Amino acid sequence: MYKRQVFVGLFITVMEFLLYKQFMDPLYKKIEAHNLMGVRKPRGEVKRRIVISGHIDAAYEWRHLYYGKKVPLMAIFMSWTIGGAIVSFILSVIAIVANFVDMGTFGDFMINYSYIFHFVTALGMVTLFMFVDFNTISPGANDNLTGTYAAVCALRMLDMAGVDFENTEVCAMITDGEEAGLRGCKSWAKNHYDEYVNSGVETVVLCVDTLTDREYLRVYNKDM
């Protein structure tokens, strides 16, 4: 039973959080979301396209970060849980071996009392279940008003400066549902696949998220 539960948990994690497959959606209530698109047309035929994107939805409050402004609670509890899980696994292997091999007093101790460490590890895992406060939505000024503002301002600045690109279309795409597994942009991409992939127009997308101080900026050119 334990192995089955572990497999199911890992399967859901890989499918939802690594591959972004939406196979769990039937279990949740459907709600309406919105994507917004602004387009600045070029001079002449559209041969190239630049899409600047930011997501409009905000995450629920993360308790460990909110209350850990002076003490790194997230790092502490993650270290507790991950470190404890590794040690618990090692102790479990030793306890199993001790059942078949005489390891003296040490082996007897592992068989009879190693469960105490498993219990301590479980306590650390419980703290992670309390990570998200589903009753409070974070204001989202950083994540991700900064991204949506940058996308909209790009078009606004081009307009104010009177810049009209030749054959290059510039778009501001504001998506919903990013915090819910990229559902907004995935839905938009599915509905506009032919328009943007099969149209023959070279398209590049710049996704802007959490645009903060320069020393913290990172540029990713592939899936993290």
Positions of predicted regions on the chain:
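Short beta-strand-to-loop junctions in surface cap/lid or active-site-entrance loops
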Residues: 37-46, 54
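Structural motif
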Residues: 48-51, 203-204
